[in-house]
């Protein structure tokens, strides 16, 4: 993978790199402009290629939901150089307050319903399942084996209810949800088929929703709400917390292995 400046030089058109927005163990994200359009660019770090995420798959999914206007419009991608550019969305972090809580939760549920009601493109990959398989291969012989087993066992238990998998975001947290007259979801790298309870639980966990607030969320979701009850979703919250730990351990191990190979 080329150095950052060399990767920038591969971008066609008039490109200007601006301030850093965020950094993670797998990527760096910056504000930028592309042909005078305000945009965001993400540069993958070496460890990104070792995860089960697939940038072409992310591009395909974003294109498939473009008309819903709930995600950024993609502008440019180069999988070889590990970069993607999408249009910047003006907005504020989605927050709940007493003045608008009911309508905000319903809007949040409605946006999630649009995703879950969208058909998954035939050529897309099952990123979530592939990620779980990768974590298993990485951790099953490590000191984190018990954490891994607890996480996977709970997932098997929760998904044994017969509910069909749907197109899911799989990474809904405060940093990935914006508000500007409507909800927008960002960072679709883990998107793909999954049990709908996972996304719902992610929102319950992120905003610490109580039982009444959970039902307000479901009133906006309105996709056979009888399938979900608060106790079930609470168990999904536990799973999401465990999965975050598994992800952190896995990424840390991959980063360590990458560093050791480089030295």
Question: What is each of the regions a protein language model found here?
Answer:
Residues 231, 235-239:
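Start-of-helix signal in alpha-solenoid helical-repeat scaffolds, especially tetratricopeptide repeats
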Residues 22-123:
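ATP-binding pocket architecture of kinase catalytic cores
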Residues 197-225, 238-254:
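Active-site activation/catalytic loop segments of kinase-like enzymes and analogous catalytic loops
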Residues 25-33, 38-41, 155-198:
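Active-site acidic catalytic loop and adjacent metal/ATP-binding pocket
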Residues 145-146, 246-263:
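ATP/Mg2+ or Mg2+-diphosphate-binding catalytic cores
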Residues 48, 93, 177, 193-195, ...:
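Conserved protein kinase catalytic core
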Residues 1-12, 118-170, 180, 219, ...:
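An alpha-helical support segment within catalytic cores of ATP-dependent transferases
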Residues 12-20:
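Conserved N-terminal boundary motif of the eukaryotic protein kinase catalytic domain
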């Amino acid at each position: 993978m080329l150095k950052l400046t060399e990767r920038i030089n591969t971008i066609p058109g008039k490109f200007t790199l601006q301030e850093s927005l965020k950094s993670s163990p797998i990527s760096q994200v910056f504000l930028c402009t592309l042909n005078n359009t305000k945009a965001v660019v993400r540069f993958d770090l070496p460890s990104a290629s070792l995860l089960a995420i697939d940038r072409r798959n992310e591009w395909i999914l974003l294109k498939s939901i473009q008309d819903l206007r709930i995600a950024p419009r993609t502008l440019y991608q180069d999988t070889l150089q590990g970069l993607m550019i999408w249009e910047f969305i003006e907005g504020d972090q989605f927050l709940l307050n007493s003045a608008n809580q009911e309508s905000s939760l319903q809007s949040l549920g409605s946006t999630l319903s649009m995703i879950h009601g969208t058909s998954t493109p035939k050529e897309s990959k099952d990123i979530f399942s592939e990620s779980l398989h990768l974590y298993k291969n990485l951790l099953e012989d490590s000191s984190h084996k018990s954490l891994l087993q607890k996480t996977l066992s709970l997932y098997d238990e929760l998904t044994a209810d017969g509910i069909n998998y749907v197109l899911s975001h799989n990474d809904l947290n405060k940093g990935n949800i914006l508000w500007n007259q409507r909800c927008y979801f960002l960072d679709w790298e883990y998107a793909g088929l999954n049990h709908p309870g996972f996304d719902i639980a992610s929102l319950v966990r992120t905003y610490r929703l109580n039982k009444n607030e959970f039902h307000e969320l479901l009133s906006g979701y309105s996709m056979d709400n009888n399938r979900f009850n608060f106790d079930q979703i609470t168990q999904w919250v536990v799973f999401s917390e465990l999965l975050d730990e598994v992800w952190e351990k896995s990424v840390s191990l991959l980063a360590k292995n990458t560093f050791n190979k480089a030295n």
